[in-house]
Amino acid sequence: MAEKFNLQDRFLNHLRVNKIEVKVYLVNGFQTKGFIRSFDSYTVLLESGNQQSLIYKHAISTIIPSSYVMLMPRKQEPEKEDETPEDQGS
C-alpha cells in the first residue's frame, strides 16, 4: 500500500524544523506571528519572543511563511535525446 501524503503535517513540520517565522490569521480576523514549536491533530503551538500561544486548528484561516516552502522537488522535464549513441562518432 502506498504511503499517504499529508500536506498539512509536512508543511507544519517543515516550518518547525527549519525555524521559519509565520504569520497566522485566525477566522475572527486576528493576526499573530511567530515560530511553530509543536503541533498535533487539533492544535498548533506558536512562540513569539517569550510568549507561547496554543491555537486550535479550527480557528486558523491561513498560515503564511516568511520564506518560500518547497515540500517536493518540481517535476523535471524529460531529457531530449537529439542524438542516439549510434549517431555519435560517425
Swiss-Prot record:
Domain of life: Bacteria
Pfam families, sorted: Hfq (PF17209)
SUPFAM superfamilies: Sm-like ribonucleoproteins (SSF50182)
Keywords, ordered alphabetically: RNA-binding, Stress response
Disulfide topology: none
InterPro entries (alphabetical): Hfq (IPR005001), LSM_dom_sf (IPR010920), Sm (IPR047575)
GO molecular function: RNA binding
Cited Gene3D superfamilies: 2.30.30.100
Sm domain sequence ranges: 9-69
GO cellular component: cytosol
Biological process annotations from GO: regulation of DNA-templated transcription; regulation of RNA stability; regulation of translation, ncRNA-mediated
Recorded family membership: Belongs to the Hfq family.
Xref: PANTHER family: RNA-BINDING PROTEIN HFQ
Role: RNA chaperone that binds small regulatory RNA (sRNAs) and mRNAs to facilitate mRNA translational regulation in response to envelope stress, environmental stress and changes in metabolite concentrations. Also binds with high specificity to tRNAs.
Subunit structure, interactors included: Homohexamer.
Name of the protein in question: RNA-binding protein Hfq
Gene source species: Thermotoga sp. (strain RQ2)
Gene name of this polypeptide: hfq
